[in-house]
C-alpha cells in the first residue's frame, strides 16, 4: 500500500498508509487525544474523523475544547434537529442548516402548520430519542441525478443539490443518520449520541437564501455544548443580551421606531433618542474642530457619473439605490459614501502644501440598499448619518497623520468609556485581487505604511486578509459589543486611488504640482449604529452628559411645593440641564419608581423640609440611599458629573 506524509502543527512529519483517517492519526498520538478529537483540518479544510486521507497534507486535530470543535457540534445538532422535524412533520420541506456565532439553525417550510415555540418540547423529545439511539453519521456521495431523486418534491433541496453539484463537478456530498440525509459538505460528528446537551431557543422568519424575492421560511434556532455549565453560561449570556438589546430598550425609553408604512430600515428618532443623537453630534463636531477638522455640508444627491469616476458604481453597485432618471439625460444617485463629495470640496480651490494636511469632516447622510433580512433596529439601516472625514496629506506625512487619527479615536473612546476594543489591519485578499484596485506596488506601499505607524506606536493588532476597501488597506477598530459580538466602530483607510482618479493636486514647496494622499476616517461610525452600540453598552442607563433627561424633580404636594420646584427647574434649564417635573396626581413611590424605570440619572424630591431649608433630596439612578444637600451643592455635583463625562475620579 502506498504511503502519505502528514505534517503536524509543530512542523513534524510522519508517514501513514494512504486512506488513514483523522481518528486513526489522533489515536496514534495518544488515547486521550483520540477521545477528545471530533474532526480534523487538512490543509485548512474540515474533514470528519472517518474520512480517508489519500494525499500528503498538513493536519490539525480538532478537539471538543476548541471553537472549531463547537462548530462541528453545532452542525451535528442542526442535523439532529432536521431529522427530528422530518419524523414529526413528514410533509415538511427543508432549506439549509448552518451555524451562528453562538449555535445553529435550520430553515424549514411546513405547509400544514407553522412550528411554534410551544412545539419545542416535543421536538426536543424527538431529538433526544435520536441522540439516545446513537445513530452513526456517515459521509456519502451521490451524482446530481441520484441526489435529485432522493430529494424529489422538495424544491429547496432540489435547488440546493443543483448548486452543490455545480460547484463540485456534478458530485453531491451529504451526511446520513438513520434514514435521514442532509445535503451538506459541512463536517459533523461520528454519531448522534455525541450531541448530549442542547436547547432549542427561538423561531423566526428567514427568506430562502436571504433574498426578499424568495419565499419566507421558518428558521428554528438552537445551541449545544459538550458540558452543561457551558450551556448554562450561554443561556445567561442570552438573557443579558435580551435585556441589553437596543431595540427593546429603544421601545421602553421611547428612543426610536420604524414604521412599516414608511419602509424598513428608515428609523424615526423620537425626542428622547433625538436628544441623545444631538448630544453625540455636538460632541463629535466640537472634538473634531479642536483637532483641526473643518466641517462642511454636502448634497445627499449627486450625478451618477461622480460614482462611476470614483469606482463605487463598479465595486459597490449592489449596495446602492437605483439611479433616478431626471428625464433630460441626467441621472442622480443617493450617495452611498461621502468621499467623492469631500473630493469636490478639495478640488474647489487650488491647494498649496501649506494647507496640508487639509482635514474635511461632515456628519453626512447616506443611503445604502441593505437587504430587508439584514436590517436590525438602528444598527443596520438604509438611511444613515456617518461621522465621516477625509484628510488630504503629503505622501511623506502618512505615518504622522495615522498616529494623529489614532490618538483622536482613543480620546473619543475614553470619553464614552469604551475600553474593550482591538485593532485590525485589513489587507486585500491576495487570492481574489479582482475585487480591488489593480496596483500591486500601491498595495504593498500603503499596507507597509499603516503597519509602520501601528508598530511605532507600540499598538497590538491582528492582520486580516480580504477586509480592505476596494481602494486601499485600512485600520479597523473592532469593538466588543455588550451582546458578545464584535463590530467595526472606527476605521482609518489609506487611499492612493481616488486622488489619481480625480486628478487631485497641490503645489509643493518646490513650486511643482504633486499628488496628495487621501485618508478616509470614521471615528464613531454612523449616528444610528453608535447610538445602538451605546444603548446596549450602557443598558439604557446613559451617563448624565448623554441622558435624554438628566434630572427628574418630584414635588411631594403640588399645591405646596410647585413654586419651589418651578424656580429650581427654571434655573437648571437656564444652565442647559435637561429637566423634567413629575407633577402627576400619582403616589410618591410610583413616581420615584418611574424615574428609575426611565433610568434618569438624578431624582430630586421636594417636600416641606426642602422648601424650608432651601435644599433638595437627591437619589442617583440605581441607588437606594438618598442625600439631602443645598441647591448649590447639587448644582456643583451635577455640573462636575457632566463635565467629567460621568467618569469616576
UniProtKB/Swiss-Prot annotation:
Role summary: Catalyzes the attachment of threonine to tRNA(Thr) in a two-step reaction: L-threonine is first activated by ATP to form Thr-AMP and then transferred to the acceptor end of tRNA(Thr). Also edits incorrectly charged L-seryl-tRNA(Thr).
Keyword Transit peptide carried by entry: no
Catalytic activity: tRNA(Thr) + L-threonine + ATP = L-threonyl-tRNA(Thr) + AMP + diphosphate + H(+)
One of the record's GO cellular component terms: cytoplasm
Domain spans labelled TGS: 1-63
Coarse class of the protein's main subcellular location: cytoplasm
Single Gene Ontology BP annotation: threonyl-tRNA aminoacylation
Subcellular localization: Cytoplasm
Binding residues for Zn(2+): 339, 390, 520
Keywords associated with the record: Aminoacyl-tRNA synthetase, ATP-binding, Cytoplasm, Ligase, Metal-binding, Nucleotide-binding, Protein biosynthesis, RNA-binding, tRNA-binding, Zinc
Cofactor note: Binds 1 zinc ion per subunit.
Co-factor requirement: Zn(2+)
Protein name: Threonine--tRNA ligase
Binding partners and assembly: Homodimer.
EC number: 6.1.1.3
Annotated stretches, region: Catalytic: 245-543
Keyword Manganese appears in the UniProt entry: no
Similarity annotation: Belongs to the class-II aminoacyl-tRNA synthetase family.
GO molecular function: ATP binding; catalytic activity, acting on a protein; metal ion binding; threonine-tRNA ligase activity; transferase activity; tRNA binding
Amino acid at each position: 500500500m502506498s504511503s502519505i506524509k502528514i505534517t503536524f502543527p509543530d512542523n513534524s512529519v510522519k508517514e501513514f498508509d494512504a486512506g488513514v483517517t483523522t481518528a486513526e492519526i489522533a489515536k496514534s498520538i495518544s488515547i486521550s487525544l483520540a477521545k477528545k478529537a471530533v474532526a480534523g483540518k487538512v490543509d485548512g479544510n474540515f474533514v470528519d474523523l472517518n474520512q480517508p486521507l489519500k494525499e500528503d497534507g498538513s493536519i490539525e486535530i480538532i478537539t471538543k475544547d476548541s471553537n472549531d470543535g463547537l462548530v462541528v457540534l453545532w452542525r451535528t445538532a442542526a442535523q439532529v434537529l432536521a431529522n427530528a422535524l422530518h419524523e414529526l412533520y413528514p410533509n415538511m420541506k427543508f432549506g439549509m442548516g448552518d451555524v451562528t456565532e453562538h449555535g445553529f439553525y435550520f430553515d424549514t417550510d411546513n405547509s400544514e402548520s407553522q412550528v411554534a415555540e410551544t412545539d419545542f418540547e416535543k421536538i426536543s423529545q424527538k431529538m433526544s430519542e435520536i441522540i439516545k439511539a446513537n445513530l452513526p453519521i456517515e459521509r456519502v456521495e451521490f451524482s446530481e441525478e441520484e441526489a435529485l431523486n432522493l430529494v424529489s418534491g422538495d424544491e429547496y433541496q432540489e435547488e440546493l443539490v443543483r448548486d452543490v453539484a455545480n460547484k463540485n463537478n456534478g458530485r453531491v456530498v451529504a451526511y446520513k443518520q438513520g434514514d435521514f440525509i442532509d445535503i451538506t459538505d459541512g463536517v459533523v460528528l461520528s454519531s448522534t449520541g455525541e450531541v448530549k446537551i442542547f436547547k432549542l431557543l427561538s423561531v423566526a422568519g428567514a427568506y430562502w437564501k436571504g433574498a426578499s424575492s424568495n419565499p419566507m421560511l421558518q428558521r428554528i434556532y438552537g445551541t449545544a455544548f459538550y458540558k452543561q455549565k457551558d450551556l448554562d453560561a450561554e443561556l445567561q449570556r442570552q438573557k443579558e443580551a435580551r435585556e441589553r438589546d437596543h431595540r427593546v430598550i429603544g421601545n421602553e425609553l421611547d428612543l426610536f421606531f420604524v414604521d412599516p408604512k414608511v419602509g424598513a430600515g428608515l428609523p424615526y428618532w423620537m425626542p428622547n433618542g433625538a436628544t441623545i443623537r444631538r448630544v453625540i453630534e455636538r460632541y463629535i463636531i466640537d472634538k473634531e474642530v479642536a483637532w483641526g477638522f473643518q466641517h462642511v455640508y454636502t448634497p445627499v444627491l449627486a450625478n451618477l457619473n461622480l460614482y462611476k469616476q470614483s469606482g463605487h458604481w463598479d465595486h459597490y453597485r449592489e449596495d446602492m439605490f437605483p439611479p433616478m432618471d431626471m428625464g433630460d439625460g441626467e441621472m442622480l444617485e443617493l450617495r452611498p459614501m461621502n468621499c467623492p463629495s469631500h473630493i469636490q470640496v478639495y478640488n474647489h480651490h487650488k491647494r498649496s502644501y501649506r494647507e496640508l494636511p487639509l482635514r474635511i469632516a461632515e456628519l453626512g447622510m447616506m443611503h445604502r440598499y441593505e437587504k430587508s433580512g439584514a436590517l436590525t433596529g438602528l444598527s443596520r439601516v438604509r438611511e444613515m448619518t456617518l461621522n465621516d472625514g477625509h484628510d488630504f496629506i503629503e505622501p511623506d506625512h502618512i505615518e504622522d497623520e495615522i498616529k494623529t487619527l489614532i490618538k483622536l479615536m482613543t480620546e473619543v473612546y475614553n470619553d464614552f468609556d469604551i475600553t474593550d476594543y482591538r485593532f485590525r489591519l485589513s489587507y486585500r485578499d491576495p487570492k481574489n485581487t479582482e475585487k480591488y484596485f489593480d496596483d500591486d506596488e500601491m498595495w504593498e506601499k500603503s499596507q507597509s505604511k499603516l503597519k509602520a505607524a501601528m508598530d511605532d506606536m507600540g499598538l497590538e493588532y491582528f492582520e486580516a486578509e480580504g477586509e480592505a476597501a476596494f481602494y486601499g488597506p485600512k485600520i479597523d477598530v473592532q469593538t466588543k459589543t455588550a451582546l458578545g459580538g464584535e463590530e467595526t466602530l472606527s476605521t482609518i483607510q489609506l487611499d492612493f486611488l481616488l486622488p489619481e482618479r480625480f486628478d487631485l493636486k497641490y503645489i509643493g514647496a518646490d513650486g511643482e504640482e504633486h499628488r496628495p494622499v487621501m485618508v478616509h476616517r470614521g471615528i464613531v461610525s454612523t449616528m444610528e449604529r453608535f447610538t445602538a452600540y451605546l444603548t446596549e453598552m450602557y443598558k439604557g442607563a446613559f451617563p448624565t452628559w448623554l441622558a435624554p433627561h438628566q434630572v427628574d424633580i418630584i414635588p411631594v404636594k403640588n399645591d405646596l411645593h410647585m413654586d419651589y420646584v418651578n424656580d429650581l427647574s427654571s434655573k437648571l434649564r437656564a444652565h442647559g440641564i435637561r429637566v423634567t417635573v413629575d407633577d402627576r396626581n400619582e403616589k410618591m413611590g410610583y413616581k420615584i419608581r418611574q424615574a428609575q424605570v426611565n433610568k434618569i440619572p438624578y431624582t430630586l424630591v421636594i417636600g416641606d423640609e426642602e422648601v424650608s431649608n432651601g435644599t433638595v433630596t437627591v437619589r442617583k439612578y440605581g441607588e437606594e440611599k438618598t442625600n439631602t444637600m443645598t441647591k448649590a451643592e447639587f448644582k456643583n455635583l451635577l455640573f462636575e458629573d457632566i463635565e467629567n463625562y460621568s467618569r469616576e475620579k
